[in-house]
Amino acid sequence: MKVVLLVCLVWMMAMMELVSCECWSQADCSDGHCCAGSSFSKNCRPYGGDGEQCEPRNKYEVYSTGCPCEENLMCSVINRCQSA
């Protein structure tokens, strides 16, 4: 029984690590992603594609609701990525 519980615990920890991509800053995220979210829960998210939610780029690289758009797209006044 102890072995089964240990295996389940290790499996759950491994799954949480795979799913969670928490970040503290842009440097924690891979290419094509930004660090976005609330002060307490930031995650690496992909840059916005055409028609997706976005936030304009800023010099501090701090984003709360979404990432900037992918290259060749711009974030419109309604916070959606569109062709530049």
From Swiss-Prot:
Primary location group: secreted
Keyword annotations from UniProtKB, A to Z: Disulfide bond, Secreted, Signal, Toxin
Keyword Amino-acid biosynthesis: no
Protein's cellular compartments: Secreted
Gene3D superfamilies: Lipase, subunit A
Cystine pairs: 23-35, 29-44, 34-67, 54-75, 69-81
Signal peptide: 1-21
GO cellular component, one term: extracellular region
InterPro entries: Prokineticin_domain (IPR023569)
UniProt-recorded Gene Ontology molecular function terms: toxin activity
Annotated tissue distribution: Expressed by the venom gland.
Entry similarity comment: Belongs to the AVIT (prokineticin) family.
The protein's name: U8-theraphotoxin-Hhn1c 2
Organism: Cyriopagopus hainanus (Chinese bird spider)
